[in-house]
Every structure is written in structure tokens, then in C-alpha cells.
Amino acid sequence: MSILIRGGTVVTADQSLRADVYCSDGVIKAVGPDLAVPSGAGVVEAGGQYVMPGGIDPHTHMELPFMGTVASEDFFSGTAAALAGGTTMIIDFVIPNPKQPLLEAYDAWRGWAEKACADYSFHVAVTWWSEQVHKDMGVLTKERGVNSFKHFMAYKNAIMADDEVLVNSFTRARELGAICTVHAENGELVFHLQQQLIKAGITGPEGHPLSRPPEVEGEAANRAIRIAEVINVPVYIVHNSCRESLQAITRARSEGQRVYGEVLAGHLLIDDGVYLNPDWDTAAAHVMSPPFRPKGHQEALWQGLQSGNLQTTATDHCCFCAPQKAMGRNDFTKIPNGTGGVEDRMSVLWHHGVGTGRLTPNEFVRVTSTNAAQIFNIYPRKGSVSVGADADLVVWDPKASRTISAKTHHQKVDYNIFEGMTVTGLASHTISQGKLVWTDGKLNVQRGAGRYISRPTFPSVYGALNRQAELKRPRSVQREAVR
């Protein structure tokens, strides 16, 4: 199948230019003005619209077994919803149970993901430590195309990685040339605060943000960053929700450390007032970790995105329907943590980013696609509009509008955290692997069409880190022997 996208403005992370884009056999074959229509090619008229790299959501959880239930969104429905919003690839997470071999968990997630209709990859979580984990990390990087390992500093008595696990895993990642990703919340403090709140009779969703204040996130982010500094490994802090974690990242980056930061679309726009909603179901629907914060944090996060100290935008798409959330009706600590957004991320960020002047269209491409592709080493195959790149593209209508609602979205969940928000700037066409999968409000997807994307490790980054380490290597002091 071949497609010519004609008459649009190509927008990449670096430039904007009037050009046509020709795609064939799943890749981009030509980019330039006034391309001739090859025989048999379909034509997408993109006049007045932007042609951009498809979005990459680097943080999703499809079909996640968590907190006594399983996320309602599966890999087919979730990737279909992503395509409807202009996102053409997700990076999900393999999360082994404590004592479960990493390879066993990886194989399970690969099996679940076979139904995906868009391309995907996996971070793998390190939830415990042993020689088996050490060995499995090596197999995953060398034979399975994994270059990133996740560490949960929260969820005590479940999947929390303590400092010993962090040190061992970060050290092994450095040996392998991988990057470490971190959910930064002090799990011991969260557990302590949860118990105090329950004893005080605060059992509803309003207790959730009280048990996870910004200081808990800031401390953990700083600790993970400093451990990474000592071990000399790159680190990526996921879902930054507050100025405290942003400050830790900004400080480390100003000191030359290789630290990256992610922000969720929801954390840029929603405040903690949602937990005070008198309707329990509405309040519980917003329970996720880290929680939504007081309004002042949102502007700080936007500034982090504008300054480049936060490089990527994600969703942490992890859906639980109302009956699942109701598992914690009498105890907020039992409400399954997670919200949706994989379908809405691009339009929400365009409306509130480009539409307000916070971001240029090029910066939008950078934070929704290209930076993630570069950080996780799949660029320029993904995240670019260039000859030889995968034909994963979105044709973006900057004037089209819609009102977001659970009644009309494609996500498999019965609420939407952006409910009632009217956004301007939508995907008119989404192209995945060179095929039109979203056209003017209609999906045309194939179950199982998604491919697993291998991600190699980072020899150039580690080459630089190794040179720095050699220059700083401690050397013993040569002294005369005592006579």
C-alpha cells in the first residue's frame, strides 16, 4: 500500500516546511514539494493542516494486574484509542511480581500484547533482587531489545524497590548500557501517612493526596537521582507531578548529570480539588499516583516543559472502571490507582500548549514524539518525518474541535478525567505502518497489526560516561615504605 500526503506543512522537532510525504511499504520514501502521485497511491489532502510524526506515549499500562484486579484497557482497545488520538506507538511496562523471574513476566506481557493494533515496546520493572534478576537483565538487553528498567520507590509490601534493589539494579544497568526509569515516591512515608489517616477516620478519596504530599515525591526523586549520580547511570523520572521533583531534576541537569523528566497531560491540567468532589465515584476515578496537585504545581510543570528540563509527555494510561474503583469504598488505600488519557494526550497538549503560546508546533512534536524516540533509542525510525523512517504519521487539523467525553471516546473505561473539556486541534488522519487507520472520525484497525519494537542500548552515551569516569577515577597515593 502506498499513500501520498499532499499539500500540508510538515512539522518536525527542528523545522516546518511546505512538503508532500510519500509512504510505501510501511516507510517514508520521499519528502518534498509537489511530489508526483505514483500509480495506485492513495492521496490524503492535507491543505491547511500539519503533517507530524505520530505521537509516542512512553508510559502506559494495558491489561495491568494491579491491586487485586486487572486494568480494563487491553492492548487492542488501548492502541486503537491511541491511534484515534494521533499516537502511533506506546511503551508499556512488564511488572514482575516479587520473586517472579523477569523473563517469565516479559513473556507473559509479550503474549498479551500480540493483539495490539499499533507498535509497542516494553520497559521492564525490577521489583526484587537476586542473581536470577541480574542474569535476566542481561538476556533482556542482549536478546529481547529492552534498554530501560523501571523502579517503583512506592507500593510497600508489593512491588517497591528499596535502596538495596536500586543500587544493585542501577549498577547492573550501567554494566549493560541501559537507562533506569523511576517512579519517585517515598514508599515508607506513604505507608506511614496512610495508616495515620485511616486511624483518623479519613477513609475516602480525599485521603489519597494527603498520604502522598509533594515532599514525598521530591525526596524520592532526589534520592534516585543522587544514587544514579554515584553509580554514573542515566536516569529518567516518570510522571513528575510537583515542583519538588522538577527542582531535583533541574538541579541535577544544571550540574551536567544525564537526567530526564516526564510529565503527564493530566498533571499539567487537573488539580487536587477533584478529590473533594461529593460524588465518591468521581473522586475515586481520579485516584492515581502521584496524585493531582494544588494548582500552583501545574504552572511549574509547564515551565519545566518549556525550559527543556522535562522532555516528554505521557499518560500513565491505566484504566479501572467504577466497580473496580469501588473495591476501596471504605478504605482509600484499596482504590486501584490509575486513570486514562492515551486517546486525549495529543489534543489536550496542543490546545493548552500550542493554543496558549506555551509551545510552538515544533516543540509540541518534540515533547509528544521525538524526545521519547531519542531518549529510548528508536530515533529516527520513530519520531521523525524523514526518508527511511517508519510511516507513522498524523495529519493534524489545528482548527478542528471536539468536546472530550466518556460517552464518545474509544478508551475502554467508563469515565474520562478530561470530561467536558473542549479542545481545538485534532488528528484528522493517523497513519500507522503506512496504512490509514484513522480518517475523519473513523477507525480502521486490525487486531494484531502492532509490532514489537526492539530498542538497543546506548553505546555513545556510555562511551561519554566511561570517559568521564576514567578522568575522575580514584587513584591510590604512592608513599614510601615505612622503614
Predicted regions and their residues:
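Histidine/acidic residue-rich metal-binding segments in metalloenzymes
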Residues: 135-313, 318-321
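Metal-associated gating/positioning segment near the N- to mid-region
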Residues: 46-115, 132
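A glycine-rich helix N-cap at a beta->alpha junction
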Residues: 111-126
